[in-house]
């Protein structure tokens, strides 16, 4: 198995760059950073934002409303796709005088292009995280504080000079919203949980990164068919399926008919409305003759193609080089990728004895791949779990007044639900370990709130 994505290789070797640092270096070569930064600073200057990092990510994530564009005299060439990062500098109307020429020097550009934190995070990471979580603050919070402070220190003077602001009074975004010791996130928009009326549901959203797991294929949705065909060509080469004939511009119907001929099952589905951009996905499964190898390929929009199609019949050099020197199927890789998720599920089952099912009365759950990771969202319906006679006000009071409340803001972003004021939402960072989450379940719910889910 190719280990280039395995960060464990670098734990004891500080001289080697991390996978994230290599990704950042590649990004600087692949993208026109100058154009992206032009957009960012143009928007910040015209918005006169005192929280520039939030404004920057919102703009680059394509989240500006039409009204906001009119307010700031920004004209974006059509077609403008919702939640799609803008990669070309905006065209400004005649009555909109850009301040960039005066304040944005080559020296500033040079600093912004090369400034990468010690953790390797860069502008690309921030944009992508917001794409993966377009309606959730998690897209902003996952950037480490060290990076945000460095970026902010570079463009804050530009904003202050342009708007005659005192740099000492300009809001320091990172210092108030990040735990700089543990580099974990806290709420960007602190809600008053006491304002959540009639608490009836609690939702947990737990995220995990899959950047180290090469079984996930990230494909551009516009080139979906072409990429599927390329993957099938690779499978064909490995398995020598002579009767497999392909077309570069194969439509969905032809593709499905072709797959059926070679014992493939294909399942097309959309996780959400495509306008929300929470990833349109396709799944292809292959069953080998010995019923032992299952190929599961998830096609997620954008980013990169990771080609690792290990079949039981294909023991190439990469497979031979794995540490156990054993034959490895793609099914083994798939199972290994979700060990962490399985551990989490087992921990929850161990403590509370409920089945982790998609519909289990008071408990519903959903697993979704999101960009470079996956999330598992679990919603507990307190009304069904505890009954109508339960004292929800007392439960809410315990949540708010617990001396452990602040402790767990380092583990979960605790907020309300935009669409329902009866739901309390706990959103985890990928940096949080399963042990910390398990501790949260036991200590917060069992010891503090007195709830036992059995």
Question: What would you call each of these model-derived segments?
Answer:
Residues 381:
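Glycine-rich tight-turn/loop motif centered on a GG-T
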Residues 1-94, 99-100:
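Phospho-regulatory, low-complexity terminal regions
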Residues 74-377, 386-454:
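Long, Pro/Ser/Thr-rich low-complexity/intrinsically disordered regulatory tracts in eukaryotic proteins
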């Amino acid at each position: 198995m190719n280990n280039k994505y395995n960060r464990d290789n670098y734990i004891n070797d500080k001289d080697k760059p991390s996978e994230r640092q290599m990704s950042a270096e590649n990004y600087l070569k692949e993208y026109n950073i100058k154009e992206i930064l032009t957009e960012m600073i143009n928007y910040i200057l015209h918005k006169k934002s005192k929280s520039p990092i939030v404004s920057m990510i919102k703009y680059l994530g394509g989240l500006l409303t039409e009204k906001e564009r009119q307010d700031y005299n920004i004209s974006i060439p059509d077609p403008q796709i919702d939640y799609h990062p803008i990669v070309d500098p905006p065209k400004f109307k005649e009555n909109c005088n850009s301040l960039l020429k005066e304040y944005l020097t080559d020296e500033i550009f040079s600093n912004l292009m090369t400034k990468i934190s010690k953790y390797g995070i860069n502008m690309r990471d921030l944009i992508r995280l917001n794409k993966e979580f377009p309606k959730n603050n998690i897209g902003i919070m996952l950037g480490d504080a060290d990076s945000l402070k460095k970026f902010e220190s570079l463009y804050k003077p530009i904003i202050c000079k342009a708007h005659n602001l005192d740099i000492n009074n300009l809001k320091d975004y990172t210092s108030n919203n990040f735990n700089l010791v543990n580099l974990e996130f806290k709420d960007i928009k602190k809600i008053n949980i006491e304002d959540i009326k009639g608490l009836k549901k609690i939702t947990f959203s737990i995220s995990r990164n899959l950047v180290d797991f090469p079984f996930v294929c990230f494909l551009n949705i516009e080139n979906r068919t072409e990429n599927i065909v390329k993957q099938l060509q690779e499978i064909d080469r490995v398995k020598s399926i002579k009767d497999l004939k392909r077309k570069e511009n194969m439509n969905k119907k032809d593709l499905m008919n072709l797959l059926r001929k070679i014992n493939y099952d294909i399942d097309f589905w959309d996780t959400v409305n495509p306008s929300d951009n929470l990833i349109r996905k396709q799944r292809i499964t292959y069953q080998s003759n010995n019923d032992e190898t299952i190929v599961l390929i998830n096609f997620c929009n954008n980013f990169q193609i990771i080609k690792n199609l290990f079949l039981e019949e294909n023991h190439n050099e990469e497979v031979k080089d794995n540490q156990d020197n054993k034959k490895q199927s793609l099914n083994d890789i798939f199972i290994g990728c979700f060990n962490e998720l399985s551990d989490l599920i087992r921990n929850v089952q161990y403590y509370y004895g409920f089945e982790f099912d998609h519909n289990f009365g008071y408990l519903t759950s959903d697993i979704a791949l999101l960009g470079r990771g996956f999330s598992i969202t679990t919603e507990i319906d307190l009304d069904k779990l505890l009954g109508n006679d339960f004292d929800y006000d007392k439960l809410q009071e315990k949540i708010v007044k617990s001396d452990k409340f602040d402790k767990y803001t380092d583990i979960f972003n605790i907020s309300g639900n935009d669409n329902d004021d009866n739901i309390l939402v706990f959103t985890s960072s990928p940096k949080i370990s399963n042990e910390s989450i398990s501790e949260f379940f036991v200590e917060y719910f069992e010891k503090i709130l007195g709830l036992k889910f059995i």
